[in-house]
A protein has these predicted regions:
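NTP/phosphate- and nucleic-acid-binding module
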Residues: 1-201
Length: 201
C-alpha cells in the first residue's frame, strides 16, 4: 500500500483475494483441502489485520495457492493485474526445503511470491497511460530543461544545470541550433515538467 500510494496509484486500484474453487478442486489446483483452507485462512487474517478492503475472487487462485491481486483498469476500461502477492504451497516441497519447528521436527514452509510494484514495465506503462506521459516531477526522467535563446546563454545554462544536478535534479540543456519556439515545443511534446528559457535579458 505504501509503494502504490507513493506513485499515486493506491486510490485507483482494487484488491482481490483470489481463492480456489472448492467445488472443483481437481480441475487445476494442487494440494489438499486442508492446505488450501489453512493458507486462505491465514491470508484472510493478515488482510483483515492490515485493514485491507478486498473482494473475493472464487476460482481465481494460482494452482499452487491463494493470492492477493491488486487490479487496475486501463484507459480502455480493461482490468489488469498490477501487483500480486501469492502463497505457494508446493515449491518448498519440490525443492526439498524445510525448517525445524518448535518441536524440533522438520516442517514444510510456504513460499510467498511478492513484489512492491509488480512488473516494473507494466507499472511504468500504466503510469505513462494514467498521466498521459506527463509524469509527476519527482518521477520524470528529465525534470528540468534549459533552453538557451542564443549561443551566448549556453555557458550560463551549463553552469546552472550543473548546480541543479549537484542537488539531485535530472537536468538537460538544449544546445541545438534551433529557434526558441521549436525548443519550447519539443520540450512540451516530450512532457518535460520545467523549461527554463535563458536569453540576454
Amino acid at each position: 500500500k505504501y509503494c502504490l500510494g507513493t506513485v499515486g496509484l493506491l486510490d485507483k486500484c482494487t484488491f482481490r483475494f483470489s481463492q480456489w474453487d472448492p467445488a472443483n478442486p481437481n480441475n487445476k489446483y494442487e494440494g489438499t483441502k486442508e492446505q488450501w483452507d489453512e493458507a486462505q485462512r491465514v491470508m484472510g487474517q493478515i488482510l483483515d489485520d492490515l485493514d485491507v478492503k478486498y473482494e473475493i475472487g472464487i476460482d481465481e487462485a494460482a494452482f499452487y495457492g491463494p493470492k492477493l491481486d491488486i487490479q487496475y483498469k486501463n484507459v480502455f476500461g480493461k482490468e489488469d493485474t498490477l501487483v500480486t502477492i501469492q502463497i505457494d504451497m508446493l515449491l518448498a516441497q519440490r525443492f526439498g526445503m524445510y525448517y525445524i519447528d518448535e518441536n524440533g521436527e522438520k516442517a514444510l514452509p510456504y513460499i510467498i511470491h511478492r513484489t512492491s510494484l509488480g512488473c516494473y514495465e507494466r507499472t511504468l506503462a500504466y503510469l505513462i497511460e494514467e498521466y498521459a506521459g506527463a509524469l509527476p516531477t519527482w518521477m520524470a526522467p528529465e525534470q528540468v530543461r534549459f533552453l538557451p535563446v542564443t549561443d551566448r546563454a549556453a555557458d550560463y545554462c551549463a553552469d546552472a544545470a550543473k548546480a541543479l544536478e549537484s542537488q539531485g535534479f535530472r537536468v538537460e540543456v538544449d544546445y541545438r541550433n534551433e529557434k526558441i519556439g521549436k525548443k519550447i515545443r519539443d520540450a512540451q511534446m516530450e512532457k518535460v515538467p520545467y523549461m527554463v528559457v535563458v536569453g540576454d535579458r
